[in-house]
């Protein structure tokens, strides 16, 4: 049997904000058998992939490549020749200083199909998130996107400096912090005024975005003072003075690197609230769901229960899917329905059910939920139980979370409930966070677990609003001290 070649999708991951991924890029990630991803692709995008998809890290740091370009080319060819659907996930747009041409050439030589999926490039997005458009009818009718490196041993770009200095109104340099002094000197030498404004934007569109403004004459000194490093975008031109409001960097939690600990059941909307406030957020651990076999014995006597209690939204969905698979008339379900979470309650209401208050334990009660939730309740209750699924930690994400924390240390770890507190205590060592107090451990804040707070030195709060106020106050104090 002759195996049919697969296909490779070169997908632009966008500049960092996961909401900037294109619809076509998202679809390619969903269909992928294997994803080769770069350092500057937000790991959250990998959550769109199927549970069986293989992740391969191809990250590159200045002067240190995790995987050489020839190895990446060979891996793309190998996976595609095995008949797999491959996504090459590249930061920004794959065609803007992304070496996509070399990788596409390797595929073409082997007769492998590929498609290009453009992405939003950081040279446009980062300035915009800093409040600066790259063009403006009064300030700039032209702009250029320029690499700040070349293939020479010196690594300084060999460019038409006179043409850039005289003819282009907005200059955008990629990854140029190392050569910033050289770039400024060249532009001044070829006619740019030393007072031309410059802004350097680090980690554009991420929650850790920072920027510093200056001129061609003094920007190097300011970058050193603020310890700005790559990845960064340099914008040069009068358009920089157009910045009137840095809408993104004015968000209340911008610059805060936070981790929310999850527990596998219905997750709290806290993570989205923090992300909307500008925080650079990690959710750990990542979970995948394994459905359990249908319990026909329980389903056959569904009409005998007086109360059915659902532990999560997933439990609701899987339970009613099981009923449908057994062709059981939903009208046999005459029990009162109750739920442990708002998400589960909403899912029941979407299906047309009225949700009652949680009922007391009885032999006529059925608890429906994940293996972990059911096993915890079996210790204390005498009712019947139906296990719909099992939540399992997705180890594919562990390495990338470790790497993210090592590159950008956490300012705070947040446990939204008692289950997440136990998850951190039992598994935090896996990502280098021990619950015991130490100089290297980030502050840990939890909701409603005073005992753990007392043992491990966590900060305990009682309500989510109190938690949000605590985080905002901590950030405000940090900014005040920095100022």
Swiss-Prot record:
SUPFAM superfamilies reported for this sequence: HemD-like, Tetrapyrrole methylase
Reactions listed under catalytic activity: uroporphyrinogen III + 2 S-adenosyl-L-methionine = precorrin-2 + 2 S-adenosyl-L-homocysteine + H(+)
Domain of life, per lineage: Bacteria
A GO term for molecular function: uroporphyrin-III C-methyltransferase activity
Enzyme class of the recorded protein, top EC level: transferase
The keyword Protease belongs to this UniProt entry's keyword annotation: no
GO biological process: methylation; siroheme biosynthetic process
CDD domains cross-referenced by the UniProt entry: SUMT (cd11642)
Entry annotated with the keyword Methyltransferase: yes
EC number in record: 2.1.1.107
Annotated Gene3D superfamilies: 3.40.50.10090, Cobalt-precorrin-4 Transmethylase, Domain 1 (3.40.1010.10), Methyltransferase, Cobalt-precorrin-4 Transmethylase, Domain 2 (3.30.950.10)
Keywords: Methyltransferase, Porphyrin biosynthesis, S-adenosyl-L-methionine, Transferase
Induction data: Positively regulated by TnrA under nitrogen-limited conditions.
NCBIfam families: cobA_cysG_Cterm, PRK06136.1
Family assignment from sequence similarity: Belongs to the precorrin methyltransferase family.
Protein name in UniProt: Uroporphyrinogen-III C-methyltransferase
